[in-house]
Amino acid sequence: LLVFALVNRPYILDLMPHKSVVQHFIKAGFDVFMVDWGTPTDADRHRTLEHYIERYMHNIVNHICDYTERDQISLLGYCMGGTMSAMYASFHQELIRNFILLAAPVDWFVRSSVLATWFAEKWFDVDKMIDVFGNAPPQWLQGSFAMLKPMSNYVEKYYGFYDKMTDEKFVEEFFAMETWVNDNIPVAGETFRQFVKDCFQRNLLVQGKMRLGTKRIDLKSITCPLLNLTASGDHLVPFGQSSPFNDLVGSTDRKSITFPAGHIGLSVGSKAQKELWPAVCQWLAERSN
């Protein structure tokens, strides 16, 4: 089961036939399922993290187990989807056979994280924003991510396109990426409020103090085989934000791979497609029936 973040659509994991994490798993013989969280409306503004994890994810996992006639699934979570998957796995370890994290943050007090600095309580009043807008606006989210690398996203990218605009393959890939990058969706207001407060501003997850409803999230409860994939050039989720996962879980079979790529290149980059994902599929196959 592939679980993506709430801020973008999940098809980045199946962007094009030759840039597809999904295709790698299918070719390796796995049944692949991917969560589409849909597009929150004003009616969803009160949806909490508990709704997404303990209701939606739990229903999805149970459905897959029923459909495949298996007692467990393997779980892959990307970015915020990885953090949410870790929360789920801590509550329902009995349903998770293997766990793969892909550029998933866990420690938000890392000094190299520009986004975490912007979201710090000193600078960002998340209550005021959600009280006014209801949900986190997609235009605001997209602009925030783009401004992490303004020259690259607003200038250099288009110079690069101009230089290669006669290259049909490059143009096709460029517009596929642009379509996805600009296909942002709102984040349900109460979910965004809790994630910003508990993770970005209080850093409760890494301290073992975060709760969903009445249940405390204990990452030590995760005991299945764990593969933690990080990107050395990730400007959105810096290495230091995601690398602590391996020391926080209770798994004895745990491995980390740091790949020379950025946050998105870790999934769709040409080098990652050729080198990383075949290795990931092999790791998973060795731990699956």
Which residues make up each language-model segment?
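Alpha/beta-hydrolase active-site loop
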Residues: 46-67
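Short, surface-exposed "cap/lid" segments of acyl-processing enzymes
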Residues: 1-41
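Short alpha-helix in the alpha/beta-hydrolase fold that links the catalytic acid
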Residues: 224, 238-248
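Gly/Ala-rich beta-loop-alpha elbow adjacent to hydrolase catalytic centers
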Residues: 76-81, 85
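Short beta-strand immediately N-terminal to the catalytic nucleophile in serine-hydrolase-like folds
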Residues: 75-77, 102, 229
